[in-house]
Regions:
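Terminal accessory/targeting
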Residues: 1-84, 106-112, 118-129, 162, ...
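Metal-dependent polysaccharide deacetylase catalytic core of the NodB/CE4 family, i.e.
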Residues: 26-43, 82-86, 94-96, 100-200, ...
Length: 357
């Protein structure tokens, strides 16, 4: 398997990357939440107090929280975004979003989007919003979108054959129809359960007019992959405001994201679980001290191995564990205290039964 990333970077000078613009008006960052609760699993939860702390920070630091539809339209139409643009999203339509999150978001007058998996709503799951609650959200201007019908693992399957693809698309289309039947027109957006996808699924969604969202970190710009848009997780261990501040202020590293390699590593089919990223700089004109570009793999720092003035590689120092892993790369923006950010998620899968998450 060829693990090649072709990046389009601005000029590097003294190890720092020159900014493309004076501000981030051509990109925006998306925050991802699940539960707003002190009793649900901590890994996907943030307390009401922590969540309000995030909202207050956005307010006092002049971030512009905008709705996702407007943000996407501005990028796709080449129109400027507000400076420091942020979008708020939730996955899974948990009831605590309605009970705990909605009052706070109304207090700050912040728009948001909820990605809904429809089966739990149909089954009257006590932890999930009802259709009446979702209708009330839509009436209040909240955007509702597709998170599949059952939150299944979409790509942890033995074979990626036509039968698999048809079943996966049926799942997505069923949820889209249920949302439309109950709520009226909804956008053709999909949030991948667990942020997991492969190239076949991305292409099928592109051909059917979907925009899709992962759970890898980073911002959104015109050069993004519209079937794998990144979002910054902001709950659980990612809820710490000190670390979140850096992410909020970051800009997406300019790159050809659609050229990123298939993120699924099939160890049962001979794929190696130490994937190598081969990075080609395409707009660098001058390269000075190179140490300023850093990558982090499963929490460990990995410096790039420079092959030439235009090429470097990054590889995990040891085999990645089963499940989801990320390569994150950052570089300081010249003249600013902020960073460019790039993330690529790998799924190491050997055909085993998926875990319960």
């Amino acid at each position: 398997m060829n693990f090649k990333l072709i990046l389009s970077l601005p000029i590097l000078c003294l190890g720092l990357i020159w900014p493309l613009t004076s501000h981030a008006a051509d990109s925006f960052n998306i925050l991802l939440y699940h539960h707003i609760s002190s009793t649900m699993p901590r890994s996907t939860s943030i307390t009401s107090e922590e969540f309000e702390g995030h909202l207050e920070y956005l307010k006092i630091n002049d971030y512009n929280v905008i709705d996702l539809a407007s943000a996407i339209a501005s990028i796709q139409q080449g129109e400027p975004l507000p400076d420091k643009a942020i979008v708020i999203t939730f996955d899974d339509a948990w009831r605590d979003i309605y009970l705990q999150g909605l009052p706070l978001l109304k207090k700050y007058d912040y728009p948001f989007t909820v990605f809904v998996n429809t089966d739990p709503v149909d089954q009257n799951n006590r932890h999930t919003m009802t259709w009446d609650m979702l209708r009330d959200l839509k009436k209040q201007g909240v955007t509702l979108a597709n998170h599949t019908r059952d939150h299944d693992y979409l790509v942890r399957k033995p074979l990626y054959d036509e039968q698999w693809l048809d079943a996966t698309l049926d799942n997505i289309n069923y949820a889209q129809q249920r949302l439309t039947d109950e709520l009226g027109p909804v956008p053709k957006w999909l949030a991948y359960p667990f942020g997991e996808y492969n190239d076949q699924l991305k292409l099928a969604l592109k051909n059917r007019g979907y925009i899709a969202f992962g759970q890898q970190s980073g911002g959104v710009a015109e050069f993004s992959d519209w079937q794998a848009l990144p979002r910054f997780p902001a709950a659980g261990r990612y809820s710490n405001l000190q670390s979140l501040k850096t992410k909020l202020a970051s800009q997406p590293l300019p790159a050809n994201y659609t050229a990123f390699t298939n993120p699924v590593i099939r160890t049962d089919q001979g794929d190696q679980s130490q994937p190598l990223l081969e990075v080609e700089l395409t707009k660098a004109q001058k390269l000075g001290v190179r140490q300023q570009l850093s990558c982090f793999i499963v929490g460990e720092r990995q410096m790039p191995n420079w092959q030439s003035k235009m090429n470097f590689t990054v590889q995990a120092g040891k085999a990645l564990g089963k499940g989801r892993n990320r390569y994150n790369c950052t570089a300081p923006i010249w003249g600013q205290k902020n960073y460019y950010w790039l993330s690529h998620q790998w799924l190491v899968y050997g055909g085993e039964a998926p875990p319960k998450e």
